[in-house]
Amino acid sequence: MRHFLTLNDFSKAEILEILSLADKIKKETKNKKYEPYLKNQTLAMIFEKSSTRTRVSFETGIYQLGGQGLFLSSRDIQLGRGEPIKDTARVISSMVDMAMLRVYKQSDLVEFAKFSSVPVINGLSDDLHPVQLMADYMTIKEIANGETIAYIGDGNNMSNSWLMLASILGLELHIATPKGYEPNKNFINIAKENAKISGAKILLTHNPKEAIEGANVVATDTWISMGQEDEKERKVKDFESFCVNKNLMSLACKDAILLHCLPAYRGYEVSDKVFESHARDIFLEAENRLHAQKGIMVWLDAHRND
């Protein structure tokens, strides 16, 4: 049985296979053709961290695939508090067909999956956001005119996930963060090893201008992640030169697209003018969460016996 916890668990061929499936299902959806790939299946959606896009996309997705979603908030379930995670996993997985977790600790996801009898999907953790990267690359394949990617901002779960995707697929990735905010060293090392096989080109820099020059795709994310509100004043000062504004964006390719996983804080990681001029890109990316995740769920269902 396969889980979707990190992109590093998948080969290039498997990632592209999932995205091809997602594209097929998206075309069917646009034609109002809803194939019941997951008829009568229940997806448990466990949220330690709240999210508009994650809940709407997964709940709508499983419904359009012929199943139903079961929403469990932090008020309904306390992972590891009271009942051990392994017991929670055993109980929930005995009653549902698949589980999606949006949590703080990646280790909680790994523990849940270890004892789950059904496929488990990482809806987000503090370390990684793999479902978002599947939507992002789906968007790149649809509308970008190249695959040189610049990530500007915090070395958070998004930068870690970009390292995984680019290093597996053999892409060129430039990451610019302020000093002290680099991506997790563990993921940097994994990416370097992957790149030896895939031929990926990865640049880590503290200069956003160096990173963005010649990029076909510019990606950014909030500087203050959920639970880091007390760091806002310090981070705003440290990230001052990392706002994707008109001047910085002008260094990218003329037809570069802009990606942001949302919510966006305009005037901080991206200027309002740049955001609005690339709204088409960003909201297509948001929509593609629905389609990419449907592809993931259908693929996992087909590989239950692996």
UniProtKB/Swiss-Prot annotation:
Keyword tRNA processing: no
Molecular functions per Gene Ontology: amino acid binding; ornithine carbamoyltransferase activity
PROSITE patterns to which the protein is assigned, alphabetical: CARBAMOYLTRANSFERASE
Catalyzed chemical reaction(s): carbamoyl phosphate + L-ornithine = L-citrulline + phosphate + H(+)
PANTHER family: ORNITHINE CARBAMOYLTRANSFERASE, MITOCHONDRIAL, ORNITHINE TRANSCARBAMYLASE, MITOCHONDRIAL
Function comment: Reversibly catalyzes the transfer of the carbamoyl group from carbamoyl phosphate (CP) to the N(epsilon) atom of ornithine (ORN) to produce L-citrulline.
NCBIfam families: orni_carb_tr, PRK00779.1
Protein name (record): Ornithine carbamoyltransferase
Organism: Campylobacter hominis (strain ATCC BAA-381 / DSM 21671 / CCUG 45161 / LMG 19568 / NCTC 13146 / CH001A)
